[in-house]
């Protein structure tokens, strides 16, 4: 039996015994985790999810926390900054060994769900977003939801950030330069995926700019 699972925005075809390198998970070596986003199960009977196969899961043992090969990015700052520089980056990964594929019963297995380290560190940011509790409110209340909180920084001072992008950041719970300046690589990856920035944070040099702007 094999399964096609999704984690960290990527898809992997796996079977029991496979060693897999995935984006860093919030788990320690020796722990068993369960991937619940299973797109397809194959074998004697093929089951395709819509989008995921109900009650299916892939269990794996965390072997080690590792780093991928170094990637060099050429960063060119625009608008207020004209400097250019190169930046090296090694993606943090987790090495896991697939131990079992569950066609059913995954929901009640009791095994810890595989969760990206970036998702865990961004939990507070996601919880701070007022969007879920405001859906049933009138239109005026929804507009107020997107407005900056009192004392919030002017995020439009960041390179490439206009009114629309500022609104998107605020809705994601980001209201100050101090928050952005404190982002880790995992936070950057999580915000990239959550708000579909497609590498904009590093490309525009937001973290460096935020550190300077936070000083006042």
UniProtKB/Swiss-Prot annotation:
Entry superkingdom: Bacteria
A single Gene Ontology CC term: ribonucleoprotein complex
Entries under SUPFAM superfamilies matching the protein: L21p-like (SSF141091)
An example Gene Ontology molecular-function term: structural constituent of ribosome
Keywords: Ribonucleoprotein, Ribosomal protein, RNA-binding, rRNA-binding
GO BP of this protein: translation
Protein family per UniProt: Belongs to the bacterial ribosomal protein bL21 family.
Function noted in UniProt: This protein binds to 23S rRNA in the presence of protein L20.
Subunit note: Part of the 50S ribosomal subunit. Contacts protein L20.
Alphabetical list of HAMAP family matching this protein: Ribosomal_bL21
UniProt-recorded name of the protein: Large ribosomal subunit protein bL21
Phylogenetic classification of the source organism: Bacteria, Pseudomonadati, Pseudomonadota, Alphaproteobacteria, Rhodobacterales
């Amino acid at each position: 039996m094999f399964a096609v699972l999704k984690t960290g925005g990527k898809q992997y075809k796996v079977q029991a015994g496979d060693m897999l390198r995935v984006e860093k998970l919030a788990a320690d070596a020796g722990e068993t985790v369960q991937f619940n986003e299973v797109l397809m199960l194959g074998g004697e009977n093929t089951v395709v999810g819509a989008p995921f196969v109900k009650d299916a899961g892939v269990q794996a043992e965390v072997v080690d926390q590792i780093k991928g090969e170094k990637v060099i990015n050429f960063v060119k700052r625009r608008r207020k900054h004209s400097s250019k520089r190169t930046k090296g980056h090694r993606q943090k990964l987790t090495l896991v060994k697939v131990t079992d594929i569950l066609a059913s019963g995954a929901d009640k297995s009791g095994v810890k769900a595989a969760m990206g380290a970036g998702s865990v560190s961004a939990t507070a940011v996601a919880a701070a977003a007022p969007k879920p509790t405001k859906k049933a409110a009138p239109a005026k209340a929804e507009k107020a939801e997107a407005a900056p909180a009192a004392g919030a920084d002017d995020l439009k001072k960041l390179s490439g950030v206009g009114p629309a992008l500022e609104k998107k950041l605020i809705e994601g719970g980001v209201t100050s330069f101090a928050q952005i300046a404190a982002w880790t690589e995992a936070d950057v990856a999580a915000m990239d995926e959550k708000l579909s920035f497609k590498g904009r944070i590093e490309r525009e040099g937001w973290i460096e700019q935020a550190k300077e702007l936070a000083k006042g």
